[in-house]
Regions:
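Intrinsically disordered, low-complexity regions enriched in Pro/Ser/Thr/Gly and acidic residues
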Residues: 80-158
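Short amphipathic alpha-helical patches
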Residues: 2-3, 26, 42-46, 59, ...
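Short, glycine/small-hydrophobic-rich surface segments
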Residues: 62-84
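Membrane-proximal N-terminal amphipathic helix
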Residues: 37-69
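N-terminal leader/signal peptides at the extreme start of proteins
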Residues: 1-10
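C-terminal juxtamembrane segment of a hydrophobic transmembrane alpha-helix
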Residues: 14, 18-41
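A generic structural micro-environment signature
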Residues: 17-22, 42-45, 68-69, 81-83, ...
Length: 158
């Protein structure tokens, strides 16, 4: 009778090979999950920056167009990663330090800020204060009004 070619103990080494493959696969799962979470956070930060720019640009367009003009914009700050929206601070009292800014506060304490300049605009809520928003998805109504010979952009969540 002929002997099979190759290693006679090949069958005995299969469990060892399977254990090695399982160990390598297990060690690569955590870095892959961390890479995915990092990608989700970067994608959220990029989308958040674009939406903050949209708020500021809309306020600037309304300032140039003048009183009586209105725009409605949809915002979506939803995130699947660990980085999440805490709140959005829009404008402030006319003439105040934050009257031309939009700030996004993240759950880790970081703040993204956009300032409306060139042209500068005064952005506030209907009560003439800053607007604080907590929703991750919302619709904003922005209207240009004349107040004491100054064009203000009134922002409210719908």
């Amino acid at each position: 009778m002929r002997r099979p070619l190759g290693d006679a103990s090949a069958l005995e080494s299969v469990p060892l090979k399977l254990i090695i493959v399982a160990a390598v696969a297990t060690m690569s799962v955590l870095p892959a999950a961390q890479a995915l979470a990092g990608l989700e956070n970067r994608e959220f930060a990029r989308r958040a920056e674009v939406q903050l720019d949209l708020i500021v640009t809309t306020a600037q367009v309304l300032t140039v167009q003048g009183p009586g003009n209105v725009r409605t914009i949809n915002l979506d700050f939803m995130s699947d990663g660990s980085l999440q929206l805490d709140r959005i601070l829009v404008g402030g009292p006319a003439g105040g330090v934050n009257s031309s800014s939009v700030r996004l506060v993240l759950n880790n304490g970081a703040v993204m800020t956009r300032i409306a300049q060139d042209p500068t605009c005064a952005i506030c809520s209907p009560s003439m204060t800053g607007l604080v928003l907590y929703q991750a998805s919302m619709e904003l109504r922005m209207a240009a009004v004349l107040e004491n010979r100054t064009t203000l952009i009134i922002v409210e969540a719908l």
